Curated annotation (Swiss-Prot):
GO terms for cellular component: plasma membrane. InterPro entries: Colicin-V_CvpA (IPR003825), CvpA-like (IPR052719). Signal peptide: none annotated. This is Colicin V production protein. The chain crosses the membrane at residues 1-21, 32-52, 64-84, 99-119.
Amino acid sequence: MVWIDYAIIAVIAFSSLVSLIRGFVREALSLVTWGCAFFVASHYYTYLSVWFTGFEDELVRNGIAIAVLFIATLIVGAIVNFVIGQLVEKTGLSGTDRVLGVCFGALRGVLIVAAILFFLDSFTGVSKSEDWSKSQLIPQFSFIIRCFFDYLQSSSSFLPRA
């Protein structure tokens, strides 16, 4: 194994450790909260921006409205996440929650590594290095990356269909 393999293992292990500490429920709610924040900010900023009459530039008003909605949604999500996390601890499900959290964290780590490997391969010369070709773990991620791009090509209007 080369240093790239150890870095891959470290990313997956760190993601798993974070999820072990936080638990599945908190990790999943955090992910949902971020998705909701993007949704709320992108769909409702026009309703809030009309209240920022102190700013003449529409771009500034919209930017402030997006930021306010995004941050407010994250705050509300954090409060909900905290309350539900406390509920999970009080019900005695924290052991199961943490085991599921490790699984969630490992999956997230694998997806993060796949994304990093894709960008390193596509936009840098790292993929031409000797360590890249000697890596035992990098070939294992080609399946994930290939499946993702096959899905994108079949579902995206931006990419030509095969």
